[in-house]
A protein has these predicted regions:
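GST-like domain detector, emphasizing the conserved glutathione-binding G-site
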Residues: 1-133
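Positions that flank functional sites
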Residues: 33-34, 169, 218
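Long hydrophobic alpha-helical segments typical of transmembrane helices together
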Residues: 189-227
């Protein structure tokens, strides 16, 4: 049986959503986060040596990493609906956005989380201004400009077509969803990035997205500081 090892409030929501789009048979095994650290519980180490989510098991096969899982599931269970024909411009866009989400943009969101924790950390009075000063320089000199450049690029892309790879919904849109939902925490999308806001409205209206929330549970993105 195909099993999604589903960590609450995590990227694994996308995998449940993809499986709903595919109409595949699967089961969900839920894991709660550690209440003190916010990290995945030790039980996930029994599934994969890194103990991270998302991860799936399919018979005797174990697949981790969002992009790898999506590629595996599309290869095994799709019937040509969620991946463009190879060699086309849409396929090249598909490959790009499938990896951009967890490569370029996820690293920025992780840095935002770390900087936010530094800015809000409980520190001795003499250390707090030093830590905040360093965090401010990283945010202003690197993080915020790069986040804006990426959001501008995504907005421009969705200004040319409804979905990231053209006029057809693909698994790359599922992969990109977490990045844009994370961006929604940072900034007011409807006024600053209307195409991104429209993208979120479109995915949230999909029956498979709603079914994934019903089965996997709603999730919240916390710790990603707003500008």
């Amino acid at each position: 049986m195909l099993t999604v090892h589903h960590l609450e409030n995590s990227r694994s929501h996308r995998i449940v959503w993809l499986l709903e789009e595919l109409g595949a048979q699967y089961e969900i095994k839920r894991y709660g986060r550690d209440k003190e650290t916010g990290l995945a519980p030790p039980e996930m180490l029994e599934v994969h040596p890194l103990g991270k989510a998302p991860v799936i098991t399919d018979g005797d096969k174990t697949v981790a990493e969002s992009g790898a899982i999506i590629e595996y599931l599309v290869y095994e269970y799709d019937e040509g609906r969620l991946k463009p024909e190879e060699g086309t411009a849409e396929w090249r866009a598909y490959i790009y956005w499938l990896h951009h989400a967890e490569g370029t943009f996820a690293s920025l969101m992780l840095l935002s989380l770390v900087i936010g924790r530094i800015e809000n950390a409980s520190l001795p009075f003499f250390a707090k201004p030093i830590a905040k000063g360093i965090a401010s320089k990283v945010r202003g000199g690197y993080l915020d400009p790069n986040v804006k450049r990426n959001l501008d690029f995504m907005e421009w892309t969705l200004g040319k077509s409804k979905w990231f790879c053209g006029d057809r919904f693909t698994a790359a849109d599922i992969q990109m969803s977490f990045a844009i939902e994370a961006a929604e925490v940072r900034t007011e999308l409807s006024s600053n990035y209307p195409n991104l806001a429209g993208f979120l409205d479109a995915i949230r209206a999909r029956p498979a997205y709603k079914a994934a929330l019903d089965k996997g549970g709603h999730y919240e993105l916390t710790g990603i500081n707003k500008n």
